[in-house]
Amino acid sequence: MNYIYHVVLPDSWTQQLNVDSYQHDSLKTEGFIHLSYAHQIEGVLQRNYIGVEKVLILKINPDLLTTQLVVEAAKTGELYPHIYGVLNKTAIESIEERFLDK
């Protein structure tokens, strides 16, 4: 199984606890939710979460997604998965709390 992952700030996740699906702000601004493969997580954290104390890492089973998953090249040419719609929470297999170095 090739799991995919989404990094989210705890406050953003908490605001959506009582709904069946998750929407990141990027869905409105870019049309999709950014995801990563396991080997990309550390780079994503280093590039996008500088100065952040804690994040949650959602482990997602792509076979359980109810919205379209597309793998696309970033500006660097590296391939990243994106979800073009909301993330159904039934596809989330686990949530890891990760403390980061400030």
Where are these regions (language model features)?
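Conserved, structured core segments of small domains
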Residues: 1-102
